Every structure is written in structure tokens, then in C-alpha cells.
Amino acid sequence: MASIRKRGKSYQITVSNGRDIHDKQILETATWTPDPNKTDKQNQKALERFAMDFEDRVKSGKYLDGEKMTFQGFAGRWMEEYAKMRLESTTTEIYRLLLDAHVIPVIGHLRLSRVQPQHLNRLYAGMLKQRKDGRPGGYSPTTVKRVHAIVSSIMSTAVQWDIITDSPCRRIKPPRQEKREVSFFTPEQASIFLAELDRGTMEGTIPLQHNIFFQLALSCGLRRGEAVALQWKDIDFADGTVTINKSMAIVEGKKYLKTPKNRTSERIISVPAHVLGMLGRYRLEYDAYRAQLGSQWAGSGHLFIQWDGSQMYPSTPDHAMRKIIARYNGAHEEKLPHVTPHGLRHTSATLLISQNVDIRTVPNRLGHAQTSTAMNIYTHALQKKDAQAAETLENLLMQKN
């Protein structure tokens, strides 16, 4: 029978749950607090019902660990027994970093079964409002949605393992990600940008490696993280191709090398002849610089590097591209739009579509998982082609009439 003991303003209910392998009695406990709006008699009946229900759940095996295990405790178990067995080591490390930075400090102390939608809403609202790295503003909805996905996986696993009965994540929605219009170059603007790269490299104001970075991003449609992660072993000069099989990500200020975002992101892409020629010249410059640096060299074969040969920081191309465009715009009346390295990938797809490249080839080259993804992203280019198709059909029909 359940034991009831008053402890301050609450009551502790204790039920025996058999004996362990050492013949030691297993005791399960629960806490009940009276309702101040009810009479003593009503609270007494409620306490007795709670004690009976608790004893029934313990005796029937329906008492779940989630009523005494904290979120932090289960998150550690989830990491070891679930995440590490199913996910890449870099992915689990990123998950651990996000949990430790954002989730554990806010809800880690809560009993797993006591985590409610309001706790998660408060967590996400706090992330959107203020960053922890001292930078102004809050985290993006994309980051918050990523954290929500991790919490949701943890809670869903707890349900599957019969530790809790329901996941609070089912009853909330993470912040909506606002679709940002990506700026990209027209064919004419792309030609101007490439010419500006070559001019700057000849004059010594744009490093050859920056020129090649942007040339590859535009001609091959690479993601920024894919380009930063490139190594010389990924370049096949004989076949004229580049192999994409890894990507660089920054999470909470730390660099992580990981496999691309989906299976189709791993691909082999043909490189234009003029870019291949630039890569050949850059290799000679690269090797000479490495020899010059001697013992100070800290590189491991990455194409795009810092002064000591170590891998280029992912934000470097963004800063460099802003400077190049600003310098050009300062000297010309016809301005270039403020396109980012990601915008070069967008430009690449748009140019391919405008040149009637098959719609199935475009996502394969850019590493999209589905053709529909490319169609959704590059709607503007497809709409222009559709308008051209309508005009062509109209001209054909008018001629027949």
C-alpha cells in the first residue's frame, strides 16, 4: 500500500516496486501539492485518489522513468544510445553543442514528463530575441528550427521507449522561416563580375585563390561550404572534374567538416577549361608559397587557405565578395547588385536554365535531392522560359492564320 508523508506544503507518496538484483527494495516516489482553492476535505480526497493512481501505475508497470528523469539526463542517454548509432560523428557533435548552448541551460533541469509546450515556446522566443555570443540581435528562425528538430527527436524517442506518454513538440510549431529573395547576376552582370575578378588578379588587388573560388562557385554551382572544403585531391586535371564529397559548416563559432546535406550532393562536376587552367597556375603558386613558408605551414591540402596554409574560414568569401562589388560600384555608374557567394550558385542555375539546359541536369549539377526542389527555387528563370514558350507558340499560330 502507498505510504503518504507530509513534507512542508506538499505530500510525498512512496510505493514499493519489488526488489532489485541485490534484494534491495525498490521505492518509487511522487510529490503531490494541495490546491489552495479547495477545502481540506476535497484536497484529502484528491490526495487519496492521486496516491491510489500512482500505486496502480507502479504496480501495473505503467509508471514511466520520465516522471523522475530530467531532460538533461535523458538527452545524454539519447545521444549515446540513439544519435551516435544513427548519425555521423560530426552531426552528433553539432547536436551536442546546440543542446549544451541553448537547451540544457533552459529546460535541462525539468523532469522529462514535465516539459510542456510553454517551456519550449519560451526557449525559442529567447533564442530569437538574444544571442549568446555577444553579437547583436537574436538567432535566425533557421537555427531555432534546427534546435526544435533536435528536441523533437529526443522527445519522440522518449515516447518510443515508453519513458513518457506524449511529446510536447507535437503541440507547438517552431518559428516560420521567412523566404528570402536571393540576389543573383544577370548574364551581363555575371560577365562584368568575372572580368572584374580577372582585372583585379592581374593588378594584384584580388588574390588568385579568391578569383578561382568565385569562378568555381559560379561555373559549378557550388555551395559555400562545399567550396571551402575542397582539397587538391578533389581536382582531377586529367578528366577536368571536381569531386564534391564534403562540406564545411560553422556552428556556435566552431568549424565542422561533414558530408554534404544529402546523397545527391555528393557528385562529380565538369569544370570549364579556363577555370581548370587557372587551377593549374594556382597549384604552382600554392606549392611555391608552401615551400616559402617552410615549418610555419599548417595546411592539409585545402585549395582555399589562410596565410599559414590552414583551411580558409567560411566567412572569408563573403567579405571578399562584398569588397570586390563595392570597389567596382564605386568606380562605375552601372552598378552590380550585392550578390553573395550563395547568389553565385543561384546565378549558375539561372544561366543554365536560360541556355535551355535540361531541367533534370540542373539539380544533378547543383546537388539538389529532387528536381522539384530546383523548380521551386529557380521559379523566376522557369517563368521567363515559360513566357518565351508562350511567345514562340503565339508567333507560330499567328503565322498559320
Residue map of PLM features:
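Basic, Lys/Arg- and aromatic-enriched nucleic-acid-binding interface segment
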Residues: 137-141, 145-147, 160, 164-166, ...
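C-terminal catalytic core of Y-nucleophile DNA break-rejoin enzymes
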Residues: 28-38, 241-243, 259-281, 298-322
